[in-house]
Amino acid sequence: MTKIQKTIDFQVHFNATIFSTILRKRRFSAEKKGDFTMSVDVTKMPKLGFGMMRLPEKDGELDLEQICKMVDAYLASGMNYFDTAYMYCGGKSESIVKKALVERHPRESFTLTTKLPQWMMDEGIEGRDRIFNDQLARTGAGYFDYYLLHSVEDGANYDGYVKYDCFNWARKKKEEGLIKHFGFSFHGTPELLDKILSEHPEVEIVQIQMNYADWDNPLIQSGRLYEVLRKYNMPFLVMEPV
């Protein structure tokens, strides 16, 4: 196994996103959120995503040459899902996505997810728009295949997303063609997850932490979260799979 292959193997196992295959399509009635169809076709997703959170460094900076090789090898394997966020790698992850992926591969050849951090929206609603515009500029992607509210959890975090009307705002971004699918990554309780999914049928996908070790963990409660997702027939992504 080459050095690059070993690095990719480490990256996939410790910073990957694994996908469930629960649902093909959902339709909501006009009485709820209007007559619209949400179609997250998980059958088209790869089994492993490429997480852009923990990336190799050289001399204190992200190692672009190494990252490009990893991205190329991942795409060559037939997989195409990349996950980043505004704050990853000290705020440099989205920019490295532009250099290693967006500028080097056709836009239609990959799927890109990024996330909105409520705790960095210092200006409130204006901060929400500033961050989103920064993300478009940083990545150069033109649009995001998946856009997630980042690390939703009980308390002030979720209250902030509600206060700044992020759910309706994201739907408008979808109508503008800047987001294809909308959801959130989640670190809260099963009760909060149930509340959000019951109140926001516009949500198309959820990302949770799930693995065998955390299935009955009283802090993470992977098993109970999974049951809530099944209740709503909700497609989901898995972080921290091993």
Where are these regions (language model features)?
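Acidic-and-aromatic substrate-binding clefts and catalytic sites of carbohydrate-active enzymes
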Residues: 58-62, 85-95, 119-126, 155-158, ...
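Active-site groove signature of glycoside hydrolases
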Residues: 139-157
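Beta/alpha (TIM)-barrel catalytic core signal, keyed to glycine-rich beta->alpha loops juxtaposed to Asp/Glu
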Residues: 34-35, 152-242
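N-terminal binding-site loop/beta-alpha segment at the start of enzyme catalytic domains
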Residues: 8, 17-110, 169, 175
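Structural preference for beta-strand elements that scaffold enzyme active sites
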Residues: 45-49, 80-81, 109-115, 143-148, ...
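Short, acidic/polar
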Residues: 61-74, 124-138, 188-197
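Generic structural signal for well-ordered alpha-helices
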Residues: 71, 94, 98, 129-136, ...
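Structural motif corresponding to the early beta-alpha repeats
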Residues: 104-129, 150-153
